[in-house]
């Protein structure tokens, strides 16, 4: 079952976030549990976090800078040990309920990139940008 998270779920969300962080290319940057919970508390109020028995997805509504009337549901994090597609569909359903005109997902720049590219293309998505990070530390 997939449901909207509440403030009572913040510890579980932080646990899942720690698992995701340890797997991700961001793992070299320390995971801050308290800040994660504070951020996710705001997201519960102003966006959405959806939970399943095996994972989570979180995101928010975002107007495109070049056309603010064009509002999309932007995925900020998505982590599941299984049934990840069900979370994706639930996020899309949430976005549709909010009246968005599109969805934006990202994928980690890791060994799963090609697999995720295939998943997104099969789900009707097209690549619109690629992100890069430069550490100054």
Regions found by a protein language model. Give the residues of each.
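Short amphipathic alpha-helix that is part of the acyltransferase structural core
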Residues: 1-30
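A short helix-loop-beta-strand connector motif used in the catalytic cores of GNAT acetyltransferases and
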Residues: 38-51
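A conserved beta-turn-beta hairpin within the catalytic core of GNAT-like acetyltransferases
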Residues: 64-74
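A short, internal acetyl-CoA/4′-phosphopantetheine-binding micro-motif in the GNAT/acyltransferase core
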Residues: 72-84
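Conserved acyl-CoA
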Residues: 86-102
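Conserved beta-strand-loop-alpha-helix junction that forms the acyl-donor binding cleft
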Residues: 104-116
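C-terminal "cap" of GNAT-fold acetyltransferases
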Residues: 117, 121-137
